[in-house]
Amino acid sequence: LLIDMDQSGVETKPIKLISGNSPFCETFFTDAIVPKKNLVHKLNKGWDVAKNLLQHERKMLASMGLGGSKAASKGKTGSGLATLSKKYVEVKEDKIVDEGLRQKIAKCDMNAHAFSLTLKRASEEAKNSNHGPSAATSIFKLYGSEHNKQKYEIMLEAMGTQGLGWEGGEFGPEELAITREWLRTKANSIEGGTSEVQLNVISKRVLDLPQ
């Protein structure tokens, strides 16, 4: 059912997350009445609608580590990891001295670029076939979740103790924002279906493996 959030009997209360943001809320229905015309699809076919919504959500979530779906579709996948890291680690001739960190940044950026091209290709194929997102979105969502978490892990590694702040004058606004966003990335492998659920979907609906 499509429900008017401003109608009588519907109340929402924000849920503040550890990141400090409130993208989620509790919704309370008290004697709320919704007209039958607001029914989406057919009666008792809500799961069909929900599954399609989940596929769209997973496609959107897949690109979050690339700066969002618009940035990914345009190939703008620069992570800014090198620029950020140079503020905190030893640099010689404009190159990060720590070879291990350099390799992590290079791998993350290359993976991001390859992933963005894959998302773009899949999006174009979906448009040309006149079909919506397929079960393959579970692959994108699974990888996108892990990629985003890895990216912020590298940021905190480069920042050292400056990446451990929660509040206080010794930490800058950008540092505090990155730390909170790092905490937020832990939810990436939960929202839109957990990584374990995605692996099940991939095995059954993409790879057609026996149960």
Predicted regions and their residues:
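Alpha-helical interface subdomain recognition
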Residues: 55-211
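FAD-binding core of flavoproteins
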Residues: 1-86, 204, 209-211
